[in-house]
Curated annotation (Swiss-Prot):
Residues 1-22 form the signal peptide. Monomer. The lineage of its organism: Eukaryota, Fungi, Dikarya, Ascomycota, Pezizomycotina. GO terms for molecular function: chitin binding; endochitinase activity. PANTHER family: ENDOCHITINASE. It comes from Arthroderma benhamiae (strain ATCC MYA-4681 / CBS 112371) (Trichophyton mentagrophytes). It is found in: Secreted. One of its GO terms (biological process) is polysaccharide catabolic process. Glycans are attached at residues 61, 135, 278, 302. Belongs to the glycosyl hydrolase 18 family. Chitinase class III subfamily. Disulfide bonds: none annotated. It catalyses: Random endo-hydrolysis of N-acetyl-beta-D-glucosaminide (1->4)-beta-linkages in chitin and chitodextrins. CDD domains: GH18_hevamine_XipI_class_III. This is Class III chitinase ARB_03514. Its EC number is 3.2.1.14.
Length: 330
């Protein structure tokens, strides 16, 4: 996609998908998430690459946002009013819009202290969460548009993320205007090196978008026709969901490259991915499929619709697709 304005073209294609409130159906198992989305329920915008960047405000980079976004003076925080309008349009069509924090270029390393972590969560909430009249001076990239939550995607060592994530959850719970979601995108080796602190530290996630690619546990090592899988380790993540997670109802999503060029390894064709979906559906924690990313899926024919069809056939619901245009780390 050449411009973030085209988020609306994805929605037009996928408007036929029926969802529960705000797109993400936490109890369901047919969600499709895409980094942005079509035949899709959840759209994480990737990425916020800094929580406290130049000027003391967050920094966002959507890679190919182009002319519609201009930085606020003295900062690297982009003002993207068109994206704000698109967010509201997507939400009216039942899509869940998340902001993904981190990615391959995130280099802050987390926070120096728990107090800094809480302050960072408050800053993100003021910047992207509900509009408060008491915070009229806050710079808001999407103007009065309010995202539906945050996705945490850290690919290097980060500190004090438990108090950060818990503060986000506290802010969610105190806000009664709508439901907000907290998700994460760990790599498939368990325990994930960079997210272990959060995953095993009492943070209540609504869904985990497991990256089953670029690793030995990737989708390319799924054995067709086998009832047990030695390398593809969805079963291990299902065990985490039921026995370790602070939220025993957390949904585990199968993360897949949306095209051959989307990841270094792990891409499988739609027919094979359907087999993975059918096998994964036997686990109660299964929540759907995540694809990286929208631009790759868009160029891959009927890949997304085939996946959505497989999910819908068994009353599985979420497809999550991310939009970033380009991300060297995936």
């Amino acid at each position: 996609m050449s411009s973030v304005k085209n988020i609306l073209s994805f929605v037009a294609l996928f408007a036929g998908v029926k969802t529960a409130y705000a797109g993400l159906n936490s109890p369901g198992h047919n969600n499709v998430a895409i980094y942005w989305g079509a035949d899709v329920d959840v759209i994480p915008l990737a990425f916020a690459v800094s929580i406290k960047g130049p000027g003391g405000v967050p920094q966002i980079n959507f890679s190919n946002q182009g002319d519609p976004c201009k930085p606020f003076p003295g900062t690297d925080l982009l003002h993207c009013p068109q994206i704000g309008e698109d967010i509201k349009t997507c939400q009216k069509k039942g899509k869940t819009i998340l902001l993904s924090i981190g990615g391959a270029t995130y280099s802050e390393g987390g926070f120096r202290s728990a107090e800094d972590a809480v302050a960072g969560a408050n800053l993100l909430w003021d910047t992207f969460g509900p509009v408060k009249s008491s915070n009229s001076s806050v710079l808001r990239p999407f103007d009065d548009a309010v995202i539906d939550g945050f996705d945490l995607d850290f690919e290097a060592t980060v500190l004090n993320m438990v108090p950060f994530a818990k503060q986000l959850r506290t802010l969610y719970d105190a806000e009664k205007s709508k439901t907000f979601y907290l998700t994460a995108a760990p790599q498939c080796p368990y325990p994930d090196l960079y997210n272990k602190e959060m995953l095993e530290g009492g943070v209540k996630f609504d869904a985990l978008f497991i990256q089953f690619y670029n690793n030995f546990c990737g989708l390319n090592n799924f054995v067709l026709g086998s009832q047990s899988q030695d390398k593809f380790n969805f079963a291990e993540w299902d065990n985490f969901a039921k026995k370790v997670s602070a939220n025993p109802d957390v949904k585990i999503m199968v993360g897949a490259p949306a095209n051959k060029g989307a990841a270094s390894s792990g891409y499988i064709d739609a027919q094979t991915l359907v087999s993975v979906i059918n096998w994964s559906k036997t686990f109660s924690s299964f929540g759907g499929v995540m694809m990286w990313d929208a631009s790759q899926a868009w160029a891959n024919g009927n890949f997304t619709s085939a996946v959505k069809g497989a999910l819908s056939a068994g009353n599985s619901r979420v497809v999550r697709m991310s939009y970033a245009g380009y991300h060297s780390g995936y």
